């Protein structure tokens, strides 16, 4: 059975100052003369790790990874200042220019699919193709499904833990209730809310329980950046106009794309991918039978696609 490509070290690392106070971490690995591919991580707020480079043949690809504003090795940690979708789109373009890349392939999952689509629609002449997983279009019904009512009926036991930091009288608008705590001055309440938010995501990300995934989401620094940045984006509708990503698909209708989605994705239901595929005739949709949301499940298919 094929697994991820072997671990590789970056051949170049960059610290790129963008809008104050942010400094982005960017690295390059694989072949300096290869086909450029940008790994666009999820969250927002999740950051990259060593596995992010391992979906691509290092002999064929020039692999670029970066930590988006406020997370991973970018600084300052969990900062919400000057942190919007369009700031991140501008960052991607700065990275492309800084590295002297003409066009690149975008490889993004979950929020990474959102951001890849937003970038491609803003800069279609700079994109060669898109490989997207776990499609997230940031529509109101998607936020409601996962953070207010929907997925709660699939995981009532995990949902109870998600609700724990929020008093009953504030549970009518859970995203706002979490946002109040995640941006408040009480650091203990902030961390309690962050872990509840992040662990809800980690526990529901896989079809079969995966303690390693949950542990990763429960780590304090990661939980704080995921929860603060995600909640900041989502209470602001991801800084998108209603249905913007589907509405603007004609801008990238000419670009080839592959959409990979787990049939049993409880975080981003399959109809997200279906709607995107219907709006994008030049795309191919691959539904992974025994998979949920996490990249650890459809990973093998993603490797075959990158080949």
Predicted regions and their residues:
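A catalytic-pocket lid/entrance helix-loop region that shapes and gates access to the active site
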Residues: 127-176
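Conserved hydrolase catalytic core segment
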Residues: 102-141
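Catalytic histidine-centered segment of alpha/beta-hydrolase-like enzymes
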Residues: 291-302
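Conserved acidic catalytic loop of the alpha/beta-hydrolase fold
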Residues: 86-104
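Conserved alpha/beta-hydrolase "acid-adjacent" motif
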Residues: 266-272
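Conserved small/polar residues in nucleotide/adenosyl-binding loops
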Residues: 303-307
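Short beta-strand/loop motif that positions the catalytic acidic residue
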Residues: 259-261
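Conserved HGGG/HGGXW glycine-rich cap/lid loop of the alpha/beta-hydrolase fold
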Residues: 20-76
């Amino acid at each position: 059975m094929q697994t991820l490509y072997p671990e590789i070290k970056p051949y170049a690392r960059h610290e790129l100052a963008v809008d104050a106070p942010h400094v982005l971490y960017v690295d390059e690995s694989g072949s300096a003369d290869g086909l450029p591919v940008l790994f666009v991580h999820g969250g927002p707020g999740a950051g990259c790790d060593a596995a992010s480079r391992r979906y691509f043949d290092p002999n064929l690809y020039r692999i670029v990874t970066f930590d988006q504003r406020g997370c991973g090795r970018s600084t300052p940690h969990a900062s919400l200042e000057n942190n919007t979708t369009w700031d991140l789109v501008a960052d991607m373009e700065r990275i492309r220019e800084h590295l002297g890349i003409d066009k690149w392939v975008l490889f993004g999952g979950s929020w990474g699919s959102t951001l890849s689509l937003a970038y491609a629609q803003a800069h279609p002449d700079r994109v060669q193709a898109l490989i997207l997983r776990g499609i997230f279009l940031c529509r109101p019904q998607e936020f409601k499904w996962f953070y207010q009512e929907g997925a709660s009926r699939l995981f009532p036991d995990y949902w109870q833990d998600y609700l724990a930091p929020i008093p009953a009288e504030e549970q009518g608008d859970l995203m706002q209730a979490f946002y109040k705590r995640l941006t408040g001055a009480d650091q203990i309440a902030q961390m309690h809310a962050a872990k509840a938010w992040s662990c809800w995501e980690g526990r529901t990300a896989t079809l079969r329980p995966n303690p390693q995934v949950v542990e990763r989401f429960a780590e304090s620094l990661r939980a704080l950046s995921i929860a603060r940045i995600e909640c900041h984006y989502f209470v602001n509708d991801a800084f998108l106009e209603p249905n913007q990503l589907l509405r603007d698909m004609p801008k990238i209708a000419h670009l080839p794309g592959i959409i990979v989605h787990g049939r049993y994705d409880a975080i981003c239901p399959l109809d997200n991918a279906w709607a995107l595929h219907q709006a994008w005739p030049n795309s191919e949709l691959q539904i992974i039978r025994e998979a949920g949301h996490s990249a650890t499940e459809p990973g093998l298919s993603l490797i075959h696609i990158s080949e």
